[in-house]
């Protein structure tokens, strides 16, 4: 097997808050994949950094009464500590506010500019007259122009999933002051993305991408690529644009360059690793980004186009994952399920979560649910009851009957050959990011080993005379099987693996060691490696999280003069044909981050199909059979995925969205008045 040379990154956490379990999904996924590559003997480097620029950081530092640099140092130290607590093994964790990143950002920009890829044009944008600052999209809220949902951000609606310009919002207000923004003109710099349309279409066919993301990208191409605004006006926290007064690079320009900046800093500290080998020269190296599905646009369009324009190597692949829900719902501060990484670590071992997340992950772009009851049961059953139990059951027999030394040859090797025979299957699962399948394969093998113990019954043999050799054989087979299982799970459970290697008196194991049996080998006395999760521990975690976040909650800024909607007459209301509809089927729409597709029974109106942008808030299966409130006479809307024939009504606020449900006495087709 030839040695591969691989660069890997996770998306950069924003340096404006703490790491939470949503972040950990991505970093656990990336870390497992990197550890697997290293276990196979490949040269694999994993870097990350804090995303350290933007208006939000400037305002946060101002609010705390410190400089942005002081804030960034505090947050970066906290982030590094949290990631290390979860056994995330970054080779280097940097910051985008660094000399390396400034130099690379300027180099890329100047190259793009010299090749004619940078445009200038005057734009009008919203400005807070009280704070005297141009407002980023996420600092503007108002009523969605498509579905009329209140308090939606300036770039997209979390209720219906629509995207729009901040100027399209109805009754917009600044989240900083509550003031109504005014329009103000400014000259901005744009990256001419449409020039790269043909290149991107070609790259997307060659790159390692998931089918769902290819569908999404096809949708974006169909809509047409637009020049990308890469500048922001002072006051702003970031890198100044060369030869441009009071202009700064938009955070999303220098943030992905941060992957390169972090790797360059690592290479400067480790001279045997060449930055140019991975990013400048056409060597046989690989480059992969692990990201959330919500930032695919930046990583699959802007980023490869920038690299192409600057004459740098492009990503070999970009791997997207879904969002994390807890107990089937969006993470909630009020329910205590918005859990910070450091809060989790106060109560539970990191490998519990690493294992559970791994068991849920696949190569698909799917959301992951952390069901806390299932989490406890799976950890207790799989890790404590099946895996660690093998060592705890067999080690005492080896100590008692063979002086802690395994046999010189296995008389019955069928079970061990079964385990070794799965090595390439499990390796393929890891390589393809099918971690859930890999875990299931390993646990099926653990079941087979436990069945072997139950069949051979060494505890019965121990009561008979003359059975020492047979018992030593059984214990040696089980401990060898335990060693193999530990190697298979080492990318997921690095600390348990290290403890197991110490117990077995082995040097750090690699994938190649699968074929090297542990014969005539002395082991140490067994000591517990993992404890069961108690329900009380989970309850304490939730309570701690709830109390911690309650203390941080502040009253949100309200618009200073946000008028209510204009009055309507009863005749206006009567124009709406509101009906009760029964959900016959509901499923996620492949290629869409937000949409669910409903098949509805509307009584005498027949069957209707509706698309609704509520995927983040509801699991499809929980809605089947429910009675919902349906707008029957809304004009059908043609979408990429089909025609939406009406609308399902929901209630929402800043934190949550819930479909309106009718009680059990209602029937499909009933009118609402």
Swiss-Prot record:
Gene Ontology terms describing biological process: methionyl-tRNA aminoacylation
Cofactor(s) of this protein: Zn(2+)
Compartment list: Cytoplasm
Class of enzymatic activity (EC top level): ligase
'KMSKS' region, short sequence motif: residues: 330-334
Keyword RNA-binding in record: yes
PROSITE patterns from the UniProt entry: AA_TRNA_LIGASE_I, TRBD
Catalytic activity: tRNA(Met) + L-methionine + ATP = L-methionyl-tRNA(Met) + AMP + diphosphate
GO molecular-function terms, A-Z: ATP binding; metal ion binding; methionine-tRNA ligase activity; tRNA binding
Cofactor note as given: Binds 1 zinc ion per subunit.
Disulfide bonds: none
Chain ranges of the tRNA-binding domain: 572-673
Binding site for ATP: 333
Gene Ontology cellular-component annotations: cytosol
Function: Is required not only for elongation of protein synthesis but also for the initiation of all mRNA translation through initiator tRNA(fMet) aminoacylation.
Family listed: Belongs to the class-I aminoacyl-tRNA synthetase family. MetG type 1 subfamily.
Protein name: Methionine--tRNA ligase
Protein species of origin: Dichelobacter nodosus (strain VCS1703A)
């Amino acid at each position: 097997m030839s040695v591969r040379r691989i660069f890997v990154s996770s998306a950069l956490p924003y340096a404006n808050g703490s790491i939470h379990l949503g972040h950990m999904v991505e970093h656990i996924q990336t870390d497992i994949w990197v550890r697997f590559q290293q276990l196979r003997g490949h040269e694999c480097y994993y870097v990350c950094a804090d995303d350290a620029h933007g208006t939000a950081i400037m305002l946060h530092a101002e609010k705390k009464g410190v400089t942005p640099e002081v804030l960034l140092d505090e947050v970066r130290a906290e982030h590094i500590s949290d990631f290390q607590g979860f056994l995330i093994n970054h080779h280097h964790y940097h910051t985008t506010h660094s000399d390396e990143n400034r130099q690379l950002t300027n180099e890329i920009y100047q190259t793009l500019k010299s090749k004619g890829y940078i445009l200038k044009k005057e734009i009008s944008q919203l400005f807070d007259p009280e704070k005297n600052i141009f407002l980023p999209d996420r600092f503007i809220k108002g009523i969605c122009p498509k579905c009329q949902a209140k308090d939606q951000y300036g770039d997209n609606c979390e209720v219906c999933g629509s995207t729009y310009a901040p100027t399209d919002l109805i009754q917009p207000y600044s989240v900083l002051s509550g003031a109504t923004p005014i329009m103000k003109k400014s000259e901005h710099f744009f990256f001419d993305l449409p020039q790269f349309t043909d290149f991107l279409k070609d790259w997307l066919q060659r790159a390692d991408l998931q089918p769902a993301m290819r569908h999404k990208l096809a949708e974006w191409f169909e809509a047409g690529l637009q020049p990308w605004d890469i500048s922001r006006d002072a006051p702003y926290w970031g890198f100044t644009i060369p030869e441009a007064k009071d202009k700064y690079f938009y955070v999303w320009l220098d943030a992905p360059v941060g992957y390169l900046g972090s790797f360059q800093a690592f290479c400067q500290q480790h001279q045997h690793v060449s930055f140019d080998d991975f990013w400048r020269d056409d060597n046989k190296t690989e480059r992969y980004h692990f990201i959330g599905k919500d930032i695919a646009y930046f990583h699959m369009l802007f980023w490869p186009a920038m690299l192409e324009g600057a004459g740098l190597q492009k990503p070999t692949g970009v791997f997207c994952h879904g969002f994390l829900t807890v107990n089937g719902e969006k993470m909630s501060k009020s329910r205590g399920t918005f859990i910070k990484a450091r809060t989790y670590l106060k109560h539970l071992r990191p490998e519990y979560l690493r294992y559970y997340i791994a068991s849920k992950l696949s190569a698909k772009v799917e959301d992951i649910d952390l069901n806390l009851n299932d989490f406890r049961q799976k950890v207790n059953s799989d890790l404590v009851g099946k895996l660690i139990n093998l060592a705890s059951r067999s080690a005492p027999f080896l100590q008692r009957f063979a002086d802690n030394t395994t046999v010189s040859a296995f008389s019955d090797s069928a079970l061990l050959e079964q385990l070794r025979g799965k090595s390439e299957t499990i390796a393929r699962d890891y390589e393809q990011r099918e971690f859930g399948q890999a875990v299931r394969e390993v646990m099926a093998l653990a079941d087979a080993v436990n069945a072997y113990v139950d069949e051979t019954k060494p505890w019965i043999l121990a009561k008979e005379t003359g059975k020492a050799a047979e018992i030593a054989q059984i214990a040696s087979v089980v401990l060898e099987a335990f060693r193999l299982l530990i190697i298979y799970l080492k990318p997921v459970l690095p600390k348990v693996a290290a403890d197991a290697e110490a117990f077995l008196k082995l040097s750090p194991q690699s994938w190649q060691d699968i074929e090297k049996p542990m014969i005539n080998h002395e082991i140490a006395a067994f000591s517990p490696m993992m404890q069961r999760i108690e329900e009380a521990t989970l309850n304490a975690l939730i309570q701690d999280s709830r109390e911690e976040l309650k203390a941080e909650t502040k009253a949100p800024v309200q618009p200073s003069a946000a008028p209510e909607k204009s009055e309507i007459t009863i005749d206006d209301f009567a124009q709406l044909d509101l009906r009760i509809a029964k959900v016959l089927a509901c499923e996620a729409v492949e290629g869409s981050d937000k949409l669910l597709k409903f098949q509805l029974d509307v009584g005498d109106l027949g069957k209707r199909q509706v698309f609704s942008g509520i995927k983040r808030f509801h699991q499809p299966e929980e809605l089947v059979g429910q009675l919902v409130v349906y707008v029957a006479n809304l004009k059908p809307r043609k979408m990429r995925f089909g025609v939406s024939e009406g609308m399902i009504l929901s209630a929402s606020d800043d934190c949550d969205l819930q479909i309106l449900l009718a009680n059990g006495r209602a029937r499909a087709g009933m009118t609402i008045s």
